[in-house]
Amino acid sequence: MDIQLINIGFGNIVSANRVIAIVSPESAPIKRIISDARDKGCLIDATYGRRTRAVIITDSSHVVLSAIQPETVAHRFVVNKEAPVNSSN
């Protein structure tokens, strides 16, 4: 299985294989997920102080905050899936 990476802004990268959901942070349930992750120490803030526009939830229950739009992250995710990087062995 190849490791595929997604740029989530400002040089930050997450593993595409570990992503469960990419959602907008405006709803109350997502705000609660962010708050719970912060309390548990499972929150990764990759916004560099900017407004949170996308919340990425991973299979390890980590929550990653990104300053780019969820649609942009999802587009990068789809493009990555269609054109995987060839690894030289």
From Swiss-Prot:
Coiled-coil intervals, chain numbering: none
Residue ranges of the TM segments: none
Pfam families according to UniProt: RemA-like
PANTHER family documented for this protein: REGULATORY PROTEIN SSL2874-RELATED, REGULATORY PROTEIN TM_1690-RELATED
NCBIfam families the UniProt entry points to: MtxBflmRegRemA, PRK04323.1
Alphabetical list of HAMAP family matching this protein: RemA (MF_01503)
Family (UniProt): Belongs to the RemA family.
Protein name listed in UniProt: Putative regulatory protein MAE_11840
Lineage of the organism: Bacteria, Bacillati, Cyanobacteriota, Cyanophyceae, Oscillatoriophycideae
